[in-house]
């Protein structure tokens, strides 16, 4: 392989937009032994996310023991579903599904067959660490939690995601060490926080954004160490509490009016160009404690990484196109949901404590030197789940890599996939609208099909909505516990791109939470609430802009698009404004 010492511009195979490959990118691809990509970063991310089903769950039996499970896999997709206990047990041997490598067919075609044969775990969880938290996914160490995802070490939380060490949080996304939170986003070390965004070390906060070390604030933004403020105006304690009673926070209509007012008020104040601290020469958003990290998103403790996302556990070095997890990783490329002491990984899904893996799925417990394997634990030198000697494996590996480049997989749209490319979506276990791809790259059914994705048609359900959205009681004071027997209609009625379930229920713990904190009932189903909440999160796209502070000439890359209404400052000007 010959690599360039200067930037090259290519046209994406999928979207046909131009993208750049920098000299340092070519050096990374050379180190990994892969061809430079022919898909742009956005389309590569979209394809990886189409293999990530976080929140679309089904009831289906384990195909080994017969027990009913909550599963990520739609029964009609043909994936063999095992419960956690059976999948981790020694009752079966995944190498019995091994198959010979066929040099007369593309590799990804053979991998697609193996995906349908080898049993896969129903959920991505450490099932022994879950207590009364069955209806969850991508979690461990939960107690009494319901419908939360990609979260760890939580108790009594509902309808949330990306939460760590939280208690009594409902409808919350991106939170750490937070207690008693509702309808909030990106909160760290907070207590009693409601309808708020980007807050840290604060308590008793309502409808506020970017507060630090504050308490008893309502509708505020960019405050530091303040208390008893309403829309950034200082009050006495007595006047603050009196004013708070006037807002009628029991009422959904009042809450919606205050939300709108607060969001308009926030637009009068500057935002820092990125969310992040203690970074060196790094670009992206929600990037922390990182060095030389470029175009990455929600990443902590990275070094020389690019196009990465959701690497929330630190110490990740020389990783490209790596989505979710992290923790002591090095030289990872085009991989998903992997981490914890891994290195030299290409095109893998759910690889933990492993090294020298290629195109392997659900690889746990010290695997090494695997190619195209599924559900192996503590194995080495396997190809398509078939065991080889070290010498046989090392002889076959370069032949397979050459074969993948000489006979690439070609999808129905005519797009080619060679060694180094992530799996084609055509062999995914999920439909597009079941996955995180729909969240970050929302499509209609027609758009998805035209782009080569599959789509899950809505299933007819045997229920009748008993209370349509407009008739849901406005004030929690007038709601009895009988509400848990009702089927409520979602306000969106399925007319959105938010995986709307059209109808939903209020659970008993959920009702008790609303009653205890005097909060109105939601008018949207959990999925639509999630999609509305993450509108507070900047997109994983970046633009070159200038600081909007008068007289400042600083430039930066930011996730705030030029046509957005927010005021955006460089770090220096922002800090001068708020500190």
Question: What are the residue ranges of the model-derived segments?
Answer:
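Long, distal/terminal scaffolding or interaction modules
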Residues: 2-579
């Amino acid at each position: 392989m010959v690599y360039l010492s200067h930037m090259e511009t290519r046209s994406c195979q999928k979207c046909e937009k131009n993208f750049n490959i920098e000299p340092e990118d070519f050096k990374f691809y050379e180190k990994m032994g892969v061809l430079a990509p022919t898909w742009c970063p956005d389309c590569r991310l979209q394809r990886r996310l189409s293999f990530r089903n976080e929140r679309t769950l089904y009831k289906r039996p384990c195909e080994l023991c017969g027990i009913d499970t909550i599963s990520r896999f739609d029964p009609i997709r043909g994936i063999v579903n095992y419960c956690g206990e059976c999948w981790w047990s020694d009752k079966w041997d995944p190498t019995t599904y091994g198959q010979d490598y066929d040099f007369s067919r593309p590799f990804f075609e053979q991998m697609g067959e193996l995906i349908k044969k080898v049993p896969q775990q129903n959920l991505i969880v450490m099932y022994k660490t879950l207590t009364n938290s069955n209806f969850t996914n991508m979690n461990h160490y939960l107690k009494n939690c319901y419908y939360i995802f990609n979260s760890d070490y939580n108790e009594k939380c509902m309808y949330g995601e990306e939460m760590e060490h939280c208690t009594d949080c409902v409808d919350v996304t991106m939170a750490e060490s937070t207690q008693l939170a509702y309808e909030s986003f990106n909160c760290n070390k907070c207590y009693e926080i409601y309808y708020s965004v980007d807050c840290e070390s604060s308590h008793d906060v309502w409808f506020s954004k970017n507060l630090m070390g504050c308490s008893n604030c309502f509708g505020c933004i960019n405050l530091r160490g303040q208390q008893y403020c309403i829309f950034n105006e200082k009050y006495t304690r007595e006047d603050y509490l009196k004013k708070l009673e006037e807002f009628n926070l029991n009422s959904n209509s009042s809450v919606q009016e205050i939300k709108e007012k607060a969001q308009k008020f926030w637009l009068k104040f500057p935002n820092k160009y990125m969310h992040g601290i203690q970074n060196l020469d790094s670009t992206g958003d929600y990037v922390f404690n990182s060095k030389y990290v470029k175009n990455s998103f929600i990443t902590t403790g990275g070094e020389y990484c690019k196009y990465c996302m959701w690497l929330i556990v630190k110490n990740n070095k020389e990783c490209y196109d790596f989505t979710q997890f992290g923790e002591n990783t090095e030289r990872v490329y085009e991989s998903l949901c992997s981490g914890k002491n891994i290195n030299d990984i290409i095109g893998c899904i759910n690889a933990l404590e492993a090294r020298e893996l290629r195109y392997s799925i659900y690889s746990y417990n010290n695997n090494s030197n695997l190619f195209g394997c599924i559900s192996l634990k503590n194995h080495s030198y396997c190809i398509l789940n078939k065991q080889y000697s070290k010498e046989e494996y090392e002889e076959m590996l370069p032949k397979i890599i050459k074969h993948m480049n000489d006979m690439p997989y070609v999808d129905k749209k005519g797009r080619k996939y060679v060694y180094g490319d992530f799996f084609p979506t055509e062999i995914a276990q999920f439909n597009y609208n079941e996955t995180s791809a729909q969240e970050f790259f929302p499509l209609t059914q027609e758009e998805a099909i035209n782009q080569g994705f599959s789509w899950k048609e809505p299933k007819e359900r045997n229920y009748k909505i008993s209370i349509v959205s407009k008739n849901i009681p406005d004030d929690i004071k007038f709601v009895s516990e009988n509400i848990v027997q009702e089927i409520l209609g979602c306000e969106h009625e399925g007319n959105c791109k938010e995986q709307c379930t059209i109808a939903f229920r209020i659970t008993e713990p959920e009702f008790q939470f609303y009653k205890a904190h005097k909060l109105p009932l939601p008018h949207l189903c959990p999925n639509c609430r999630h999609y509305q909440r993450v509108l507070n999160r900047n997109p994983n796209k970046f633009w070159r802009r200038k600081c909007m502070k008068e007289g400042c000439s600083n430039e930066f890359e930011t996730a705030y698009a030029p046509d957005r209404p927010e005021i955006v400052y460089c770090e220096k000007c922002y800090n001068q404004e708020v500190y």
